[in-house]
Curated annotation (Swiss-Prot):
InterPro entries: Condensin_barren_su2 (IPR022816). The lineage of its organism: Eukaryota, Fungi, Dikarya, Ascomycota, Taphrinomycotina. The gene is cnd2. Regulatory subunit of the condensin complex, a complex required for conversion of interphase chromatin into mitotic-like condense chromosomes. The condensin complex probably introduces positive supercoils into relaxed DNA in the presence of type I topoisomerases and converts nicked DNA into positive knotted forms in the presence of type II topoisomerases. The condensin complex probably also plays a role during interphase in processes such as DNA repair. The keyword Cytoplasm applies. This is Condensin complex subunit 2.
Amino acid sequence: MKRASLGGHAPVSLPSLNDDALEKKRAKENSRKQRELRRSSALHSITPRRESLNNSSPFNSSHQVPVLSNFEEWIKLATDNKINSTNTWNFALIDYFHDMSLLRDGEDINFQKASCTLDGCVKIYTSRIDSVATETGKLLSGLANDSKVLQQTEEGEDAENDDEDLQKKKERKRAQRSVKTLVKDFESIRAKKFELECSFDPLFKKMCADFDEDGAKGLLMNHLCVDQHGRIVFDSSDTVIKDLENKDVEAESQEAVVAAPIESHDTEMTNVHDNISRETLNGIYKCYFTDIDQLTICPSLQGFEFDSKGNLDVSLLKSLSDEVNMITTTSLVDNTMEKTDADAASLSSDSDGEEGHIVHALEEMAYDEENPYVDVVPKAMDESENPDFGVDTEVNMADGSTMNENYSIISTAAANGVYEYFDKSMKKNWAGPEHWRIQALRKNINNASTVFNSSNTAESSDNVSRSLSSTERKKRRELDNAIDFLQEVDVEALFTPATSSLKLPKSHWKRHNRCLLPDDYQYDSKRLLQLFLKPKMSVLPNADGEGQLQLNKALDDENDLDGIQPHGFDSDGSDNVDEGIPPYGFGDSDSPKQTPLLTPPSSSGFGDNLLLTARLAKPDMLNYAKRAKKVDVRVLKEKLWKCLDLENTIKENSINSHIEGSEMESEETNMPVKSFFSTVNQLEETYEKKELKDISTSFAFICVLHLANEHNLELTSNEDFSDVFIRPGPNLTTLEALENDV
């Protein structure tokens, strides 16, 4: 068997599994084909340049339809802002912009389409620039990363050393920059002048808020106030702190501030304020309040003790004097002792008496009008509460006489009872619900003594039997009045007129207010310190204290007490509250000689509450809707001038005065007179109702003032200032009026 020779057969070629060169070749071919396709698509979409308008062929017209469709699609995407860096290279709108045939509508150019194409071209151009920038950035970043990787692999140690050197250089540069940025002098940064242009004045803001466009309410003078010195100021609710006039006090306060120890910044400020306040208060005390311990707030009530539960209404308190106390205490003690003895005798009944009589007697004592001191005198006479009661101690009176201390205790206690009654029951100048309260009826003393006297038991038993018999008779009479239904009804007896009538008698008809409560005036002494028209504004006392000090020094002299006149109300009816309160009561019967021990007042207030500086209460503003009124002032002036109808008279007078000369000027011509009230009423004929609502009298008067300045009119008011009369003024001859007439 012959062996086949190997030379006649071709060698077998095995394909390589990973051929990099072949793969690169295929990738290049694919990319080349894609580029050709893109170029061909772009070239097909571009219209060929027309050499002339006349050289038009059916071939060009056939290609015009896809070009227009692509153009409209690209414009739509451009207007919708759908062009970005990824699809910007697929639009060929920039290449078609030079072709004006796409922008024409017949013979005219569609500028709206041209503006849209220009906007789209700008968007495509900017997006292409962005895409180029991003692609180049990616390329540069990739190259930089590759170079860094190669440097790290090849030069590992050298790269670390270079990085350390770079970090050291950066640290050195930062240190140098920190020195440059710091400011050596702080004064260069400090703001010397504050920018106050943007800030607004709160008073100006309030004035603008209160401004009213309607008329005179919005004027500036109507929003200003007058202070106690007569100055016109804004309505600010800040308290004014007056500077001290005593320079010595200021010097002492400054020395105290300098000598004060300073530990820190915070303690320094607190010590300064403390020293200033103490020194100023000491100086004020030395100047004004040196003799404050010897003064009394209200000398007429010096020996009076107020009740904690009662009302301290000064208008209801009566000034007490020593001689009046002597007169009242004697009668008061006699009356109270008699009444208390009688009441005690009525209460000292035997144990066999009923409890109802005792309760009735207590009610009598409680509601007895002639004995208002029952609840006060027993307390003063109680020996357990007053251990010194009964000891005969004498008190020297002003006139040299003596008075027992027991009587003085009873008198002061009785006076307390009087004022407690007035404070609780009559503090509002009327009885209130107690006016209709049913009070217990008084019984005769003989009947009470026969019932409660244990000595006359026989008489009491007879009276009791009589009372029982009377009650039995009444019950029998009530039982005898039985109705018999079997008897015939007497018609005449049924219809007989009754003796008693249901109507009120005629005597009560005139007194129709007899069953009504009295008028509730609710008088209060604080009304003396308030204004009538502005009740929230209180009259402040004399804050200066200059004239008041001299008055107090004159009054404090004990030798001149007899010459002091009572500080009552003036004869002309004017009561000046700032000059002080009448120290001897409101009546004319009190005189200064009756109260020699009482010192005159040195303060001008009713109590401690009025010593504080009271702020002026701001009235509550009503929140109401404001509507801006729109008035044409020029039209209003024209209509008012027509209503006045003075133009013809002015022209006639000017012509006559020009012709006749000075003789006509000297004579007084009878000028027509128009009233402001009538002219304003004539506006109703020219304006509609809606427009007339916006026109106020202030607007009309302002327009009349303008007309008076322009046409030389004379304004005069009547006697009661209720109306203004308008007439032409003198010397109205002008050359301009004559030229206009000619």
